[in-house]
């Protein structure tokens, strides 16, 4: 008998639902209707009703939790074990191969040697799991009882994000970025993709499906540079992204739908979360390499009985009891990173024949060798020329580069407010180079006269316009020269180089999670038959969420905890805004460059002066009224349906 619920035993013992919660409901499969048999919330219902406390089915005072990897997924798992599973924090141990926690959420350096951030975070207000966690994590700089979310809201509510120079070309001229430039057939292709079932898209690439005109449109330039998609990446993942961010499509060109942190990703998220966990009592063992798991497999299931580690050069096996649990972060987007600086290019010590041998990938491969339920890691780590790119972090003292930056900034770069509002893409760059300056300082102890900029390029294997080398062959100074050329300040290059420290990072797997995939290539969070093992991170299957976000890492961690402990809680599916008629209508108009969509005039006529008039997108769609008004729009609608059906 559970002492927590003993007063409810009559109800619970008679319930067919108790102990059988669907922890990962799927909104793409659910018809939402209330019935006498329905007792749980709809699959994507969000809000405070979902904030009920988890009730453990047993005591975990003697259970040990081993979390392999201390990135955001692993840390989130620890948080949910503590908050919802009521597992004592002292029972939780991280096993981390590196000398520092945080995984891919890095941010380090100083003004003398230069700062480095391999990537950054473009955040969305609909990251329900991320904000669910960070509303409970004490703030980095505000006093108790304020949280990380409170800090995030405070700065973003009072400093709106937008870009005034999303695209530039012709040596620094701001290019018109007000239009998507999609023709009617390309708009219909997007709609057809949204209508397709996910099962139809196994192993298809974006260029398999979309036309050349789509791939040359402003829309695709906005999309690919914001999210780091390549033409050869997964069409399925692109579809999921379009559903996930449909509500934000009218902010795609000026980035006004984004909310950014005050500092870099490590100081904003990792530092306060790690501090919270350590104060609760979790154990973090750094420099501990996990090589394999000892899994007992029989007809009754799969049980982890040991963790094979390497510590101080010696193999050590950690026993795992039947009441213990193991969480593994599979794969890695930032392992095998190679670094360069002002005077040296990264020395790349990897190719397709040697890829996927680092710790995170090797562990996943060892699991996959035991059973097909653990997926196919080689689908993601075996083609690095299609999964890699290089970034550069610029630590800048005042120079001609900063003077030029001010022309593209919505606020003074030294004001602490939004600067570029996100990436600025150079459309005539052979490398398709983009750069950004987020709120400054980007590091808490950063000097007042220093700015930190970030640069990356999608076509790093192409010869530069100014420096006749590929980006990979370039030193930091040469990458800086290429940037200055595109900004029209190459004549002041000596001044810029003298005042700029460049640290580069080549990441062979940075978009490996975007590689084309099919059903079964990624394992489920709790693979079939696993009793005490959960897999988390960017390379596990969720119903409808996307990869390359902190939200998906937190989601997988939360699912793992709820499933393994069989808690009385669901992890709601992605925010349901994709089904909101307001956002669907807005998207239709936005894709058409704010010109009326088919049937808009009729809708405005029907809804004019009614309570629901406001659901229509902004902007009048005045059309000439005549006797055949309705017939004309019915015919247009028929043609539109024909187009969708292809």
UniProtKB/Swiss-Prot annotation:
Gene Ontology biological-process entries: fatty acid metabolic process; response to fatty acid; response to toxic substance
Catalytic activity as recorded in UniProt: (R)-10-hydroxyoctadecanoate = (9Z)-octadecenoate + H2O
GO-annotated molecular function: FAD binding; fatty acid binding; oleate hydratase activity
Pathway field: Lipid metabolism; fatty acid metabolism
Active site: 122 (proton acceptor), 241 (proton donor)
Free-text comment on the cofactor: Binds 1 FAD per subunit. It is presumed that reduced FAD (FADH2) rather than oxidized FAD is involved in OhyA catalysis in vivo. It seems that FAD does not undergo changes in reduction/oxidation state during substrate turnover.
Key words, A-Z: Detoxification, FAD, Fatty acid metabolism, Flavoprotein, Lipid metabolism, Lyase
InterPro entries to which the protein is assigned, alphabetical: FAD/NAD-bd_sf (IPR036188), Oleate_hydratase (IPR010354)
Listed EC numbers: 4.2.1.53
Effect noted on mutating residue 436 to A: Large decrease in catalytic activity
Residue numbers binding FAD: 73, 96-97, 104, 122, 127, 290, 332, 549, 553
Ranges of compositional bias, category Polar residues: 33-48
Domain of life: Bacteria
Consequence recorded when altering residue 122 to A: Loss of catalytic activity
pH dependence: Optimum pH is around 6.
Activity regulation: Is not inhibited by EDTA in vitro.
Basic and acidic residues biased stretches: 20-32
The protein's role, per its UniProt record: Catalyzes the hydration of oleate at its cis-9-double bond to yield (R)-10-hydroxyoctadecanoate. The hydration of unsaturated fatty acids is suggested to be a detoxification mechanism and a survival strategy for living in fatty acid-rich environments.
Alphabetical list of PANTHER family matching this protein: 67 KDA MYOSIN-CROSS-REACTIVE ANTIGEN FAMILY PROTEIN (AFU_ORTHOLOGUE AFUA_5G09970) (PTHR37417), MYOSIN-CROSSREACTIVE PROTEIN (PTHR37417:SF3)
Protein name stated in the entry: Oleate hydratase
Organism: Elizabethkingia meningoseptica (Chryseobacterium meningosepticum)
Organism placement in taxonomy: Bacteria, Pseudomonadati, Bacteroidota, Flavobacteriia, Flavobacteriales
